[in-house]
Amino acid sequence: MSSLTIRNASIADIELIRELNLQVWPQTYSHLQTPGQVNYMLDMMYSKDALEKQMADGHQFIILYDKHIPIGFASYGEIEEHIFKLHKLYILPAHHGGGKGRFVIDFIKNDILTKGAEALQLNVNRKNVAKNFYEKIGFKVIRSEDKDIGNGYFMNDYVMEKKLTNEHEEFKNSL
């Protein structure tokens, strides 16, 4: 685990984020959605313009490295006072396991606690096995959501949340 590092991303990293995503998304979603929907969502959420807009809208992107090799990325941001959302968390399939996802979540949690976070939310496709990982690290399903994303496609997700209130108190006491 000591070989893992995270750094904040910028607009200069958009091509790297897109490259990583193209290695993750087809494998992750090809059995959950039609090829047409996968391609539509890739263009909608991961085009250069879409990523620039997300960054301009306050999404904090980070890149995960293992021994200086980029192996994943995430983005997150505040969606309402004291509530933050994990917008994306993707790690190359060959690098799954070994606590890397937890390492990223802990990094994000520590960052947002400094900003007064009381909860971290995320959306996960209802058929995505990543739901099990999120439950294992303390997220709970708070509702189901079917979001029309255009072109006749829907995102059929669980909205999950991890309360950080106790962790926020522990964090404040450690300062």
Question: Each PLM stretch: what is its role?
Answer:
Residues 118-131, 135-140, 147-175:
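C-terminal "cap" of GNAT-fold acetyltransferases
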Residues 8-14, 18-94, 105-107, 111, ...:
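Acetyl-CoA-dependent GNAT
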Residues 33, 41-42, 99, 125, ...:
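Residues at secondary-structure transition points
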Residues 9-11, 114-121:
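Short, charged low-complexity linear motifs
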Residues 2-5:
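Extreme N-terminal starter segment of soluble prokaryotic enzymes
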Residues 69, 89-106, 113-115, 125-132, ...:
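Conserved glycine-rich acetyl-CoA-binding loop
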